[in-house]
């Protein structure tokens, strides 16, 4: 019996294309991942990202949050590479992949219904990379399109663009060459009406340019939103009905009516612990009063607490009143200290209200640079910033867990804020690691880590170009569109507010921005105001607290830090310094006690716990690569005598010959009449022949030395 074969027909296949900043963006639907709730193959230039979205049929029980999972998955075959791991396959997500996942999650999460409890998974798999076309942009557009046309309720779509600044011009979706020279790297996500996400790193960019870039990106994003709406109009599915999270409105109304005065008194304090103690006591009163009437009230208490606190905080903030009594533009009490830990290379303790961060700086040789196995053409990572948020910082009684995405994200934000002010490798040939330990958290720990890390870097003697300060801006909006911004948000304002707009920078300009929202987006007016008030706050923090603590980087690194010395040799001499099988460089390391790292361009970095070892290693390398120069004087040792002349050692292993005719102005019958083995004499290089043989003159050297002495010049 013959085999029956039927050819698969993709009858539902559809494709849409638009121009995105001069390059084609294509979204294909109906050909891949057919069993997912929604899927698409997104092609931007030659960058290809497969996006699949799935939703569970039923809500997850026992949770009070929306269970959204976003995964940005890098495949190294996308750039024609085999993973460097032992198993030669992709393992846990790289840091850039984790940050890309957060980048997609943050603008989309607020646009899902607040009480939606069905699991939603968005998986973006990078399958091909064109470095001129960002995979993150393609992934976010694809995720937005898939969720929008799926049955999942979503208040989108959103679009996404990257913004650069090259040669004084704002550039949208810069290509690879433009990114290398761009002074800012900004990712903007937005709906047709409002901006929903900003993530930025910049080289001290003025606020006005940053704002102009965001506005320009939003105008272009509106075209993407219209493009996705066209797709939804053609293939969009009916939105699913879902079980709304249960809430007892009747119980809540009674609590508000009976306990408003007590609740306001509980909230009105700058001490987080006092507030929580008061609130817990009030919840006990709720039990006493309502448990008999509402025996199932425990399941609603958390939501009642959230709504009640938000009601009070929102009303107060709209009136210009804050829970701790501050004005809208008032920063909590600050303290800064350096040199906190005695034997580390640098440390800084920064305290803002009940938020406290200890940052510690460690210096090492460039061999300690981090190597990343990612889809990006990134060189070794010289500066590493790690952020730790232990449970005790918020008073939780549990064991610490492994690093989570939030910690990765906050560390990356601080890193992005500080990289623009770091010295070049030539100026400061060290690998630098800063660890920010959150000791106490009541809001804005990421910005505290930026301030504390600036202090630690300066304490460590890192010659940063300018100190960096970070501050956050909050937002509350009324139903009529009126709004109130406020500076330096604390925990309760972050929890119940609608925005956490983090800005870091120097007095010259912005170095980093991260904007997180809990609403449907920001108008341009709000963004402009947030940039203005955070600028004033940065200046105040620098002038009044950080610079009085330490006005400039220390002139020397810590005595406990490795000493570094950099030198440059002819690249052709590298093999001589390394030696066969590394024998020469191993000998240098063993005899000097210093470590030696050699780059392909001939740059050599020497490191040791003490300067003497560095100098010894440098002297040995200088000897190995020594090349005599014609016309120069050298002081050497006579090591061999032949009938026709004497051989003089200019450096270990480097000899030259003084012909008998070059020993004196008169005729010399015997070499030993002028010099003997072991004599230290001055010689002048007269010639280096095509075979590399060095010819010397003793008599010319004597004449030149006499002339210099007569002229009062020293001979070295």
How should each PLM-predicted stretch be described?
Residues 124, 196-201, 242-246, 257-266, ...:
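Short, hydrophobic beta-strand segments
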Residues 151-267, 457-555:
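Mobile "lid/hinge" segments at catalytic clefts and subdomain interfaces of large enzymes
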Residues 114-120, 155-157, 224-242, 273-274, ...:
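Flexible, glycine/charged-enriched surface loops at secondary-structure junctions
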Residues 24, 36-121, 126-128, 133, ...:
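Glycine-rich, flexible beta-strand/loop modules in the N-terminal catalytic cores of phosphate-handling
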Residues 2-56, 241-377, 562-576, 584, ...:
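Extended amphipathic alpha-helical scaffolds
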Residues 560-562, 566, 571-716:
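Single-stranded RNA-binding regions, centering on S1/OB-family and related RNA-binding modules
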């Amino acid at each position: 019996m013959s085999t029956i074969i039927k050819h698969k027909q993709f009858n539902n296949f559809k494709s849409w294309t638009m121009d995105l900043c001069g390059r084609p963006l294509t979204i294909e639907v109906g050909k891949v991942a057919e069993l997912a709730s929604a899927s698409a193959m997104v092609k931007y230039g030659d960058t290809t990202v497969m996006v699949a979205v799935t939703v569970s049929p039923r809500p997850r029980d026992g949770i009070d949050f929306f269970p959204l999972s976003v995964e940005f998955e890098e495949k190294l075959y996308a750039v024609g590479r085999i993973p460097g791991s032992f198993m030669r396959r992709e393992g846990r997500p790289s840091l850039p992949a984790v940050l890309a996942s957060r980048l997609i999650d943050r603008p989309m999460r607020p646009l899902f219904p607040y009480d939606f409890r069905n699991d939603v998974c968005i998986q973006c798999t990078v399958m091909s990379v064109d470095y001129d076309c960002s995979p993150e942009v393609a992934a976010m557009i694809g995720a937005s399109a898939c969720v929008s046309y799926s049955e999942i309720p979503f208040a989108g779509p959103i679009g996404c663009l990257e913004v650069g600044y090259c040669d004084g011009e704002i550039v949208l979706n810069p290509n690879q060459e433009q990114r290398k020279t761009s002074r800012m790297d900004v990712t903007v996500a937005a709906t047709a009406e409002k901006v929903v996400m900003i993530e930025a790193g910049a080289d001290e960019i003025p606020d006005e340019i940053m704002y102009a870039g965001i506005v320009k990106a939003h105008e272009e994003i509106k075209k993407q939103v219209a493009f996705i709406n066209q797709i939804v109009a053609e293939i969009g599915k009916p939105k699913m009905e879902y079980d709304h999270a249960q809430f007892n409105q009747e119980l809540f109304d009674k609590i508000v009516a009976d306990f408003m005065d007590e609740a306001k008194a509980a909230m009105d304090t700058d001490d987080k612990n006092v507030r929580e103690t008061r609130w817990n006591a009030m919840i006990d009163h709720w039990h006493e009063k309502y448990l008999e009437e509402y025996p199932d009230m425990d399941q609603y208490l958390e939501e009642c607490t959230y709504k009640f606190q938000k009601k009070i905080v929102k009303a107060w903030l709209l009136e210009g009143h804050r829970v701790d009594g501050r004005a809208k533009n008032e920063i909590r009490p600050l303290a800064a200290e350096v040199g906190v830990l005695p034997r580390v290379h640098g440390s800084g303790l920064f305290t803002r209200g009940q938020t406290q961060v200890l940052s510690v700086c460690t210096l090492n040789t460039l061999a300690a640079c981090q190597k990343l196995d990612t889809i990006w053409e990134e060189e070794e990572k010289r500066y590493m910033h790690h952020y730790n948020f232990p449970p005790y910082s918020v008073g939780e009684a549990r064991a610490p867990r492994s690093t989570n995405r939030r910690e990765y994200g906050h560390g990356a934000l601080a890193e992005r804020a500080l990289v623009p002010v770091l010295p070049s490798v030539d100026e400061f040939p060290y690998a630098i690691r800063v660890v920010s330990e959150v000791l106490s958290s009541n809001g804005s720990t990421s910005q505290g880590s930026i301030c504390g890390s600036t202090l630690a870097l300066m304490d460590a003697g890192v010659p940063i170009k300018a100190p960096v300060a970070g501050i956050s801006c909050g937002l509350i909006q009324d139903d009529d569109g009126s709004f109130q911004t406020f500076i330096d948000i604390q925990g309760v304002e972050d929890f119940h507010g609608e925005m956490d707009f983090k800005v870091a920078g120097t007095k010259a300009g912005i170095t980093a921005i991260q904007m997180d929202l809990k609403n449907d987006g920001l108008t341009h007016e709000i963004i402009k105001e947030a940039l203005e008030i955070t600028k004033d706050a940065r200046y105040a923090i620098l002038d009044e607290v950080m610079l009085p603590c330490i006005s400039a980087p220390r002139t020397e690194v810590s005595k406990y830090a490795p000493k570094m010395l950099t030198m440059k040799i002819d690249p052709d001499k590298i093999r001589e310094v390394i030696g066969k099988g590394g024998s020469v460089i191993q000998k240098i390391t063993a005899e000097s006690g210093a470590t030696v790292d050699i780059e392909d361009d001939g740059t050599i970095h020497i490191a040791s716990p003490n300067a003497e070892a560095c100098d010894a290693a440098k002297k040995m390398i200088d000897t190995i690569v020594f090349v005599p120069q014609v016309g120069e004087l050298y002081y050497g040792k006579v090591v061999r005598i032949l009938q026709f002349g004497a051989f003089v050692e200019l450096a270990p292993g480097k000899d030259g010959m003084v012909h008998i005719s070059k020993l004196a102005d008169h005729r010399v019958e015997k070499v030993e009449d002028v010099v003997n083995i072991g004599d230290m004499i001055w010689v002048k290089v007269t010639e280096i022949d095509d075979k590399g043989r060095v010819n010397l003159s003793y008599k010319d050297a004597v004449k030149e030395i006499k002339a210099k002495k007569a002229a009062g010049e020293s001979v070295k």
